[in-house]
């Protein structure tokens, strides 16, 4: 398992770097709330700033503690996931990838919130009147990682053969 630990942290670091790079590209090239139509009627790049959590929850909160509380809670989750990876004796492939993706995505969003007090979102999917909430690479990694963990949880485990 020691080799896998470093691979997991490497995957997380790549997700973190990709997330930070894409946010930087948007922050330096797209004004807040400007829109670039990538696939008209389906996908846009829209620079938005989220001071809350997923789906804009707490975005309108005026509490001076909002950012501190969110950084502490999400930071604790990052530490917990990193410790799970470090202490794991064995991980199925789906759990390995799932935890690695979640760790990288969560670290990316925690970094932004701690450094800037907000998270930059820019990926905008929609179809006609249906509009998904704007998100970023870190959010995508967290969702894909969570799905992989769910698949691993629901997938039947192989039973050891009975030798008697």
Curated annotation (Swiss-Prot):
Top-rank EC class of the record's enzyme: hydrolase
Active site: 121, 139
Reactions this protein catalyses: Release of signal peptides from bacterial membrane prolipoproteins. Hydrolyzes -Xaa-Yaa-Zaa-|-(S,diacylglyceryl)Cys-, in which Xaa is hydrophobic (preferably Leu), and Yaa (Ala or Ser) and Zaa (Gly or Ala) have small, neutral side chains
Functional pathway: Protein modification; lipoprotein biosynthesis (signal peptide cleavage)
E.C. numbers: 3.4.23.36
Key words of the record: Aspartyl protease, Cell inner membrane, Cell membrane, Hydrolase, Membrane, Protease, Transmembrane, Transmembrane helix
Pfam families in the cross-refs: Peptidase_A8
Membrane topology: Multi-pass membrane protein
Subcellular location: Cell inner membrane
One Gene Ontology biological process: proteolysis
Molecular functions per Gene Ontology: aspartic-type endopeptidase activity
GO CC terms of this entry: plasma membrane
Transmembrane domains' residue ranges: 68-88, 96-116, 134-154
InterPro entries attached to this UniProt entry: Peptidase_A8
Function: This protein specifically catalyzes the removal of signal peptides from prolipoproteins.
NCBIfam families, sorted: lspA
Family: Belongs to the peptidase A8 family.
Protein's recorded name: Lipoprotein signal peptidase
Taxonomic placement: Bacteria, Pseudomonadati, Acidobacteriota, Terriglobia, Bryobacterales
């Amino acid at each position: 398992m020691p080799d896998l630990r470093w691979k997991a942290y490497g995957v997380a670091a790549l997700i973190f770097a990709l997330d930070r790079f894409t946010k930087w590209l948007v922050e330096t090239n797209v004004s807040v709330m400007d829109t670039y139509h990538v696939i008209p009627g389906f996908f846009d790049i829209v620079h938005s700033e989220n001071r809350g959590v997923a789906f804009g929850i707490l975005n309108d909160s005026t509490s001076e503690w909002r950012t501190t509380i969110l950084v502490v809670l999400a930071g604790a989750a990052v530490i917990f996931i990193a410790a799970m990876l470090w202490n794991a004796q064995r991980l199925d492939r789906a759990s390995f990838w799932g935890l690695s993706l979640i760790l990288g995505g969560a670290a990316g969003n925690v970094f932004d919130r701690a450094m800037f007090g907000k998270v930059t979102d820019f990926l905008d999917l929609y179809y006609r009147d249906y509009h998904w909430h704007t998100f970023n690479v870190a959010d995508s990694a967290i969702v894909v990682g969570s799905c992989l963990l769910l698949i691993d949880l629901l997938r039947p485990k192989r039973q050891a053969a009975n030798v008697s």
